[in-house]
Amino acid sequence: MSTLCLPHVMFPQHKITQQQMVDHLENLHADHPRMALAKRMIANTEVNERHLVLPIDELAVHTGFTHRSIVYEREARQMSSAAARQAIENAGLQISDIRMVIVTSCTGFMMPSLTAHLINDLALPTSTVQLPIAQLGCVAGAAAINRANDFARLDARNHVLIVSLEFSSLCYQPDDTKLHAFISAALFGDAVSACVLRADDQAGGFKIKKTESYFLPKSEHYIKYDVKDTGFHFTLDKAVMNSIKDVAPVMERLNYESFEQNCAHNDFFIFHTGGRKILDELVMHLDLASNRVSQSRSSLSEAGNIASVVVFDVLKRQFDSNLNRGDIGLLAAFGPGFTAEMAVGEWTA
């Protein structure tokens, strides 16, 4: 069975508190008739601070999709390479040991993919398999883990480098006055992570036993982008907040088939931080105590929703916690489609 090793997570230098973001929105849209409601909804996100690739004052003046794409590529190249080198070292491997590289990102576009940059910059083997994932949004990190696991199961030498990179602030639309635009502007944060999935049993971490994918039919409108001249405009249907009830039975079945116990008896969880409501729904439908998802809540509070990076940030927090060898855990993330990707396994660190 393959093992997720200690990730390396990086944040851009610019930081913004939630109060600063509220003040910014109030100044920008002083006469908005629903600003009081927006402020209450932003307070309910339970996000305290986030990191941004540019200061909020620069983001408040939309300089065009071209300029934002230049910033995206510049920061992506620099931060991804640094994170990747540290992740490979964390896994106890050499660069030449990597046989596949996966990059997840839904907040910018590059062609060739960032996978090509990493092969060149790190001097990965020329036979390295590339898998860029661009349109799975927040679920992409977990999807990358599961696709890496599929590849690793073919050969005990098939070690995989996964790099997740999200600069959601570059999708901020200061002229968008829709209520959900205000909420997303205060919810999503910027971050980069790199993590190695080792195909052998020679490292400690989250050893994957079984994975599962789930697609909710006729839910494409739940989470989507409207692509306009100014770039990506994020839209969210409130129906997504009730989607966990559909995927919870799938998680329970996966868990029981793997360990003959319900999720409530697991020792740890690595959940995507879609927002406070999503975490509350997981607690309710999996019959968990609220503190069982404390690592995800901490990630949400300290970094915001960092999309495909979330599962790796929460995984890193589990490495810093007091888990014991043999503890059983569930990893799950959710995104456009509506899509869920899940993995269950044991702690071996």
Curated annotation (Swiss-Prot):
Q: Which UniProt keywords apply?
A: Acyltransferase, Antibiotic biosynthesis, Transferase
**Result, substituting residue 60 to L:** No change in activity toward lauroyl-CoA
* Catalytic activity as recorded in UniProt: 3 malonyl-CoA + 3 H(+) = 1,3,5-trihydroxybenzene + 3 CO2 + 3 CoA
- The Enzyme Commission number assigned here is 2.3.1.253
Q: Which InterPro entries match?
A: Chalcone/stilbene_synt_C (IPR012328), Chalcone/stilbene_synt_N (IPR001099), Polyketide_synthase_type-III (IPR011141), Thiolase-like (IPR016039)
Instruction: Write out the GO MF terms.
Output: acyltransferase activity, transferring groups other than amino-acyl groups
Entry annotated with the keyword Transferase:
yes
Q: What outcome follows a substitution of residue 256 to R?
A: 2-fold increase in catalytic efficiency
Entry keyword annotation includes Membrane? no
- GO annotation terms (biological process): antibiotic biosynthetic process; polyketide biosynthetic process
One GO cellular component assignment for this chain's record is: type III polyketide synthase complex
* Record annotation: effect of changing residue 21 to I: Does not affect phloroglucinol production but shows 50% decrease in activity toward lauroyl-CoA
Q: Mind telling me which SUPFAM superfamilies this protein's record contains? A: Thiolase-like
Pathway where it operates: Antibiotic biosynthesis
Give the matching CDD domains: CHS_like (cd00831)
Q: What is the effect of changing residue 54 to V?
A: 1.9-fold improvement in thermostability. Shows 110% of wild type specific activity
**Stated family:** Belongs to the thiolase-like superfamily. Chalcone/stilbene synthases family.
Q: Which residues form the active site?
A: 138
Listed name of the protein: Phloroglucinol synthase
Pfam families named among the record's database cross-references: Chal_sti_synt_C (PF02797), Chal_sti_synt_N (PF00195)
